[in-house]
Regions:
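Glycine/small-residue-rich loop that forms an oxyanion/phosphate-binding "nest" at active or ligand-binding sites
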Residues: 1-35
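Histidine/lysine/aspartate-rich catalytic loop segments that bind and position anionic ligands
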Residues: 21, 52-105
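C-terminal helical cap(s) of enzyme catalytic domains, especially alpha/beta-barrels
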Residues: 28, 87-92, 144-167
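Catalytic cores of alpha/beta
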Residues: 1-8, 60-70, 115, 119-133
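Aromatic/hydrophobic pocket-lining residues that form the small-molecule binding cavity
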Residues: 35, 39, 60, 95, ...
Length: 167
């Protein structure tokens, strides 16, 4: 399974996402309010291999605190709701406030902060201008943009957006 792949490849970081085997894409972060012994075992196994562990999370401070208690090094904020409501200014403002508070809280308890899901060249810039993150995960949008603009140009565009924020 996934842990065997992690042990074999030993990536610098792995992000644990609460998807089931038949799920096509992520639609929520971890709910850590119940028994998490299996997840804790996976985190401990990755930590023993010196692999940074990130947990895919909704912007919920209580859940983020539990991620820290389980031994995660980082969280990856699930940005689907932000992207979905990007064109609605009221919803966007509320979402940006939630993500900002979640990011600041995570940083205050020494968790790194990543973000990802449905971020694209249109909504990424505003997100990064409002939220403190260490890295972003861009997948589908990058490949979709590359189909029309080419991979080289698309990667450069995303890097420019990120470097404006990260440099």
């Amino acid at each position: 399974g996934f842990m065997n792949l992690i042990k074999e490849l030993k990536p610098e970081q792995c992000t644990f996402v609460p998807d089931d085997n038949h799920q096509i894409t992520s639609d929520h972060g971890w709910d850590l309010s119940s028994n998490n012994n299996d997840l804790k075992d996976c985190i401990n196994s990755a930590n023993k291999l010196n692999i940074r562990v990130s947990l895919f999370m909704d912007p919920d401070k209580r859940q983020i605190q539990k991620a820290k208690e389980l031994g995660a090094d980082r969280i990856e904020l699930f940005t689907g709701p932000y992207a979905e409501n990007f064109l609605n200014n009221d919803s966007k403002r509320l979402n940006l406030l939630k993500y900002s508070e979640a990011s600041l809280f995570a940083k205050s308890i020494d968790l790194g902060v990543n973000a990802g899901h449905d971020l694209d060249q249109i909504n990424l810039r505003e997100f990064l201008n409002n939220i403190t993150v260490d890295e972003v995960s861009i997948g589908q949008a990058l490949i979709s943009d590359a189909l029309t603009d080419g991979l080289d140009k698309t990667v450069k565009n995303y890097l420019a957006i990120c470097q404006n924020k990260f440099s």
